Amino acid sequence: MRADSGAQGSAAQDIMINPLDSYNIRVVTPTSCDKYPGRYTSPYSAHRKHHARNVARKLGASSGLIFLSGQPTINLRDSDQSRPFRQRRYFYYLSGVDEPDCSLTYDIEQDLLSLYVPDFDLHRAIWMGPTLSREDAQDRYDVDHVRYHASLKYELQAWLDERKQGSELYLIHDSEKPEHLPKDLPLNLEQLRPAMDTARGVKDEYEIRMIRQANKVSGLAHRRILESIQSMSNESQIEGSFLNTCISHGARNQAYQIIAASGPNAAVLHYDRNNETLNKKPLVCLDAGAEWNCYASDVTRTFPLTGEWPSDYVRDIYKLVERMQDECIRLIRKGTRYLSLHNLAHDIAIEGLLALGVFKNGTIHELRQSGVSKVFFPHGLGHHVGLEVHDVSERSIMAIQRSDELQYRPILNSTCLPPCTLSAPLLEEGMVVTVEPGLYFSPLAMANARHQPYARYIDFDVAEKYVHIGGVRIEDDILVTATGYENLTTAPKGEEMLAIIRGSA
């Protein structure tokens, strides 16, 4: 049942919208739930509408209206089946609503956060179950007002009629502009996204709790695979086991495609075919992380199938990557430039590969400046984690002096993500970042390296002896705290990991 767009005025508005209330189907559950911090409840009452207010502060605006659309229901092309639903993260950040076809407004001056839910549709309710009602939404989400979608255009018009001179409508994308707006309405499409990116870079207590829970479930799933890996014969079984554990513990969604790469497949950074035999493979690199209430975890473990290192080659590369991670994590604290940790990881990799004979003919400084270490460590040390597995954050063009750029440029590439970039600000308390060093022996990368100026630093005969390994990566999610750091990742690694595989833990 939809409102007739021909009616006008507040009286007509009430007539059209209020009857929708009579169709509510309300489900009452006996369990309590945390309300998402659109505004905080006790004991955080001093931080009401924390996220919305924080974004307004980053905007530097005392008035204006923020409008955000959630993910609409969309069918697959040439099909009557809908696409798997995934909520838009900017919308979720201000609302906590993980339901399709919703939208919100935040009136900065009035400090009013309003949620708009789908109009009741009897046919849809019969076939798919009821959509979110106003009462359920008001109970579940900590917003000031809940309205049906039919009232949105009237609410927007009311704001337009009363808005102050200079007040703007803030949008992320021009394509999300609400219908029925005057063509001459001043839209601000430039400031909202940077403001929200900056706000999202530092997590509050609720967000940290969600990321910690996502890591807890991921840790259980990784542990279950270690316990049963000796009975598995194909990468697909690893993927299936991980999904089964996550779903059975309440985490239906993965933060990203599972990477279950055995042997040489582990040299492909985002390998996700997950369909090859494990037979005679020295290692499995499992990069998999569950999502909890839209918040991601990002966890990688690399392990031998028997719980014993099959050769010195395999053990030496694992131990080198383990050292890279341990030394970088130990230095995380607020005020640290993350890029310096990336630099340290490359220095440790270069030192280790020199000792193993993969590198030759140069000092650590010479090899770093040549860029040769990117052949075997081609990605950034880490990135932010939050509502996205590669989460957003502030970008400050003043973060690094031009004179310091030369020492970092050779070991950076276009795939490096904040905070592992020249423009990233220093680490702050509340940031969650990954530390994920890796060493890979990709035949393609090594073939290309033969034609580069830094080829003289590589002993290709020695490097070829490691190709069967594929690659080793170890990745944890690290919270920056007031006094240092907390490792949120609970998946076993190192000697504990090996003992679990052997059944001796």
Swiss-Prot record:
Short name of one Pfam family: Peptidase_M24
Residues engaged in binding Mn(2+) 1: 298, 436, 475
Any one GO MF annotation of this record: manganese ion binding
Keyword vocabulary terms for this entry: Aminopeptidase, Hydrolase, Manganese, Metal-binding, Metalloprotease, Protease
CC cofactor note: Binds 2 manganese ions per subunit.
Keyword Aminoacyl-tRNA synthetase: no
EC number: 3.4.11.9
Residue ranges of the TM segments: none
UniProt keyword annotation of Iron-sulfur present: no
Entry binding sites for Mn(2+) 2: 287, 298, 475
BP GO terms, sorted: proteolysis
Gene3D superfamilies for the chain: Creatinase/methionine aminopeptidase superfamily, Creatinase/prolidase N-terminal domain
Family note: Belongs to the peptidase M24B family.
Task of the protein: Catalyzes the removal of a penultimate prolyl residue from the N-termini of peptides.
Name used for this protein in its record: Probable Xaa-Pro aminopeptidase Pc16g13390
